[in-house]
């Protein structure tokens, strides 16, 4: 067991609760101690929801430990069924229920006798899966449950929709810009003449899940959520899926061409090449921007990218292919799917890092000293400590990355948003310099030490004065190089002589 003050992916029950609370009229009951029920507050705050989060905690307390949980859990399920009249109640296991070895499946069977709606136990092992894996499994489980139920009752609709149609799978609550991406993907499908059959799980009714096989294909924009469901629908209903994330000009075009291929294989003749060219040349500003002098100023600049598989891979490709930025390190915290990530990014970056240890990532950033970081909320904190600008491109995120305005990452409008984010993340060198020359609020000394270790070196007055003469936008680098040189040579104090020797050593 490892004590962590920062987790990139939360525990399994958070993933299950994200899926349950994304659906319409589905209630989740969490069998957990006080403290595990922070999901309600987190979702209400971050998503700015007007409605209460449909999650109830069945608290494990001393009475439960003494007498067992069955009576309490069953009563809570039946009570909520009567009060809320949900279509489905999902009972969510937690690490506590696993430790207590509660027979939750038996509780569900018992509660189903008295409940009017459906009751389902989320089939996730709390010690084997994290938030993302649990969300993927829970969505698959709910879809499978309702499709099999409809099949038994012979209520499955026969045949496909008259016009080409799509299911968009994987849009959920607390996802990174998910609502904006969903709107952009719907607009993209409309432009292509494709009807949206269902969007799951966000805002979907479980009663409509039986309509999923009517679509011509499934679109899975995020690798972390929805892939298992899409694979199940392909196996059971011969429903093809597209799992190319339409992020960036190149990948959006590739995604549209794949959709074209799938639709044409089903007896229709569509050609989207003119649409792709028109969007790339005239609608999306990203292709034009990448040829402008502004973007050429970024050519060869060093960047570090870190996030979930989908976003980290997509941003790495955009930076390297479309903007000419040098990605020194690309990393992901999705260790369970590391092979896919390596395959996607290895040709676009110097180094690949697969880790969920924020200290390791922080140290790598301090070592590389990139011009900009593209990562999660944690990398933003690291960037602030090292005075390196950071653009947030993946969850986990805080409130400022749940924007009120329209900011998709997918589709052609997404390419514009990403181009803005990238350009605005790089510090323009003269900005710091001018602030120091003419005075301003931003004259703080650059924090230049590594993330994990405090500096053990002293600077004498002359050396400190000389350092302060160095322009702000390179001062951090000069300080780090000098301290590195001093440590290697065994100096405990940095004087002017040491500083000049360090300068000669690095050939500056």
Curated annotation (Swiss-Prot):
It holds the Pfam family Oxidored_nitro. GO terms for biological process: light-independent chlorophyll biosynthetic process; photosynthesis, dark reaction. Substrate binds at residues 429-430. Its EC number is 1.3.7.7. Signal peptide: none annotated. Pathway: Porphyrin-containing compound metabolism; chlorophyll biosynthesis (light-independent). It is an enzyme of class 1 (oxidoreductase). Keywords: 4Fe-4S, ATP-binding, Chlorophyll biosynthesis, Iron, Iron-sulfur, Metal-binding, Nucleotide-binding, Oxidoreductase, Photosynthesis. It comes from the Bacteria. GO terms for molecular function: 4 iron, 4 sulfur cluster binding; ATP binding; metal ion binding; oxidoreductase activity, acting on iron-sulfur proteins as donors; oxidoreductase activity, acting on the CH-CH group of donors, iron-sulfur protein as acceptor. Binds 1 [4Fe-4S] cluster per heterodimer. The cluster is bound at the heterodimer interface by residues from both subunits. The active site is at 294 (proton donor). Its cofactor is [4Fe-4S] cluster. It catalyses: chlorophyllide a + oxidized 2[4Fe-4S]-[ferredoxin] + 2 ADP + 2 phosphate = protochlorophyllide a + reduced 2[4Fe-4S]-[ferredoxin] + 2 ATP + 2 H2O. [4Fe-4S] cluster binds at residue 36. Belongs to the ChlB/BchB/BchZ family. Component of the dark-operative protochlorophyllide reductase (DPOR) that uses Mg-ATP and reduced ferredoxin to reduce ring D of protochlorophyllide (Pchlide) to form chlorophyllide a (Chlide). This reaction is light-independent. The NB-protein (ChlN-ChlB) is the catalytic component of the complex. Protochlorophyllide reductase is composed of three subunits; ChlL, ChlN and ChlB. Forms a heterotetramer of two ChlB and two ChlN subunits. HAMAP family: ChlB_BchB (MF_00353). This is Light-independent protochlorophyllide reductase subunit B. The gene is chlB.
């Amino acid at each position: 067991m490892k004590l962590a003050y920062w987790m990139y992916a939360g525990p399994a029950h958070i993933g299950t609760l994200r899926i349950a609370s994304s659906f319409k009229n589905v209630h989740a009951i969490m069998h957990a101690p006080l403290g595990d029920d922070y999901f309600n507050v987190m979702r209400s705050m971050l998503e700015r929801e007007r409605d209460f989060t449909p999650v109830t905690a069945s608290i494990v307390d001393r009475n439960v430990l003494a007498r067992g949980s069955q009576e309490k859990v069953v009563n809570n399920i039946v009570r909520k069924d009567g009060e809320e009249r949900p279509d489905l109640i999902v009972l969510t296991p937690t690490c506590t229920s696993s430790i207590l070895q509660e027979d939750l499946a038996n509780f569900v069977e018992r509660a189903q006798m008295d409940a009017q709606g459906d009751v389902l136990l989320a089939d996730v092992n709390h010690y084997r899966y994290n938030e993302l894996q649990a969300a993927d499994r829970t969505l698959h489980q709910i879809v499978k449950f309702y499709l099999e139920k409809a099949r038994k009752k012979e209520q499955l609709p026969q045949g496909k929709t008259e016009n080409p149609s799509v299911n968009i799978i994987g849009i959920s609550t607390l996802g990174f810009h998910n609502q904006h991406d969903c709107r952009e993907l719907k607009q993209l499908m409309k432009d292509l003449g494709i009807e949206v059959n269902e969007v799951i799980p966000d805002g979907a009714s479980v009663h409509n899940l039986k309509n999923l096989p009517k679509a011509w294909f499934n679109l899975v924009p995020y690798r972390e959520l929805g892939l298992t469901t899409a694979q199940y629908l392909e196996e059971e209903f011969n429903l093809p899926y597209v799992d190319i994330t339409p992020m960036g000009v190149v990948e959006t075009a590739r995604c549209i061409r794949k959709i074209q291929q799938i639709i044409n294989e089903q007896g229709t003749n569509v050609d989207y090449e003119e649409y792709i060219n028109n969007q790339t040349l005239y609608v999306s500003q990203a292709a034009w921007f990448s040829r402008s002098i502004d973007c050429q100023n970024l050519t060869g600049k060093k960047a570090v990218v870190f996030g979930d598989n989908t976003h980290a891979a997509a941003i790495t490709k955009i930076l390297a292919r479309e903007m000419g930025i040098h990605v020194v390190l690309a990393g992901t915290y999705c260790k369970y799917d590391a092979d896919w990530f390596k395959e996607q990014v290895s040709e676009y970056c110097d180094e690949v890092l697969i880790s969920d240890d924020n200290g390791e990532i922080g140290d790598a950033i301090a070592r590389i000293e990139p011009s900009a970081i593209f990562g999660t909320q944690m990398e933003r904190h690291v960037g602030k400590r090292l005075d390196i600008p950071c653009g947030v491109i993946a969850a986990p995120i805080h409130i400022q990355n749940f924007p009120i305005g329209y900011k998709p990452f997918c589709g052609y409008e997404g390419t514009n948003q990403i181009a803005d984010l990238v350009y605005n993340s790089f510090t323009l060198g003269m900005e710091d310099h001018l602030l120091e020359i003419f005075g301003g609020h931003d004259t703080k000394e650059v924090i230049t030490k590594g993330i994990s270790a405090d500096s053990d070196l002293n600077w004498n007055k002359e050396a400190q004065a000389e350092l302060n003469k160095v322009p702000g936008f390179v001062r951090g680098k000069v300080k780090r190089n000098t301290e590195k040189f001093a440590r290697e040579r065994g100096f405990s104090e940095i004087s002017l002589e040491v500083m000049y020797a360090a300068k000669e050593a690095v050939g500056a």
